[in-house]
Structure formats: structure tokens, C-alpha cells
Swiss-Prot record:
Top-level division of the source organism's lineage: Bacteria
UniProt protein name: Ribosome-recycling factor
Pfam family, one: RRF
Stretches assigned to coiled coil: none
GO BP annotations listed: cytoplasmic translational termination
Compartments where found: Cytoplasm
UniProt function note: Responsible for the release of ribosomes from messenger RNA at the termination of protein biosynthesis. May increase the efficiency of translation by recycling ribosomes from one round of translation to another.
Database matches in HAMAP family: RRF
Family the UniProt entry places it in: Belongs to the RRF family.
Organism: Geobacter metallireducens (strain ATCC 53774 / DSM 7210 / GS-15)
Length: 185
């Protein structure tokens, strides 16, 4: 009984940490990544489509993203979508491809980004702790319904706390890695 509750908790906590990693991919560091353009939608035959579904995205240099649309007529549409996204960079095209050169981040902007990263990490830790609370509540209900003994409950609570500590440490690790990436000049 307790194993299922703990396994379910681990799965939910892992999803929280994965969600943080995905959010961090969208945060601009000094380096170019195609993840910066993940949220951009382009009008394609009347439907808003993700940029990655209408063009090939690549990072040929550390501060440059190239976008190669599958149809040349999409170039102005893609440029407009990038400009409307307010990401802080301007696309340039040569008729076949669109190049985005990322300007270097200022020290002030880097510190703002780190502050945002820390808030995102803290929100994830809160989510992990809420999952712990729900797990412990489930275990207490099992004990109340006499499906597990009081000793089993205490052992399971300790295991739940250990699992929670592990996932909080993972969040810290992800934050530290991204922080280093942002502060790297």
C-alpha cells in the first residue's frame, strides 16, 4: 500500500522538476538556443502553428539562431511573429533564411534573470512540498482505515521525507546549473 503512494508521489515530483527544466529552456541566457522560440506561433494556411513545424531551427554559433522556412513565402510572417513576441532581438533575412543575432546580456539583466530563476525554483519546491503533504495525507488515511499499521505509517513518512529532500536537492541542482549558465560572460 505505502509503496504505491510513494511511487505516485515520486512520479508527480519528477513531473514538477521536468516542468522547471522546460521553463528554464525558455529563459534567455548569453547563449542562443532554439528553446527561446518555442512559444512563437506562425499563421500557416490560416492556422497558428509552432515555428518548429514550419521551419528548421538551428544554432550555428553561440549567439546566432538560424531559421530556414520550408516555404519562402513564410519569411515575412515568421519575422513579424518574432517581432511581435517581444523577445528583445531583431530578425534579419537574406531571402532564404532568417538569422537572429542575440545581443550580449548586461550585468543588470543577468541579475534580473537569476532572480526570476530563483522564484521559479522556489515555486517548484513549494509544488514538491505540496505533493509530500498530499502523500502523507493519503498514508494517514490508510492508517486511519486500518490498512497499514502505525509503525508502517512512521516508516513511510520518513521515506516520504527522504524522497522530498532528494527532489528539493534536484531543484537546487537545476537552479545552480542554469544560474551558472546565465552569469557566464
Amino acid at each position: 500500500m505505502t509503496k504505491e503512494v510513494i511511487a505516485d508521489m515520486k512520479a508527480h515530483m519528477e513531473k514538477s522538476v521536468d516542468a522547471l527544466r522546460r521553463e528554464y529552456q525558455k529563459v534567455r541566457t548569453g547563449r542562443a538556443t532554439t528553446g527561446l522560440l518555442d512559444d512563437i506561433k506562425v499563421e500557416y494556411y490560416g492556422n497558428p502553428s509552432p515555428l518548429s513545424q514550419v521551419a528548421t531551427l538551428s544554432v550555428p554559433e553561440p549567439r546566432t539562431i538560424t531559421i530556414q522556412p520550408w516555404e519562402a513565402k513564410l519569411i515575412p510572417v515568421i519575422e513579424k511573429a518574432i517581432m511581435n513576441a517581444n523577445l528583445g532581438f531583431t530578425p534579419a533575412n537574406d531571402g532564404k533564411t532568417i538569422r537572429i543575432s542575440l545581443p550580449p546580456l548586461t550585468e543588470e539583466r543577468r541579475k534580473e534573470i537569476v532572480k526570476t530563476l530563483k522564484k521559479m525554483a522556489e515555486d517548484t519546491k513549494v509544488a514538491v512540498r505540496n505533493i509530500r503533504r498530499d502523500g502523507i495525507d493519503s498514508l494517514k488515511k490508510l492508517e486511519k482505515d486500518k490498512k497499514i499499521s502505525e509503525d508502517d505509517l512512521k516508516r513511510a513518512e520518513k521515506e516520504v521525507q527522504d524522497v522530498t529532500n532528494t527532489f528539493v536537492a534536484k531543484v537546487e541542482e537545476v537552479l545552480t546549473h542554469k544560474e551558472k549558465e546565465v552569469l557566464e560572460v
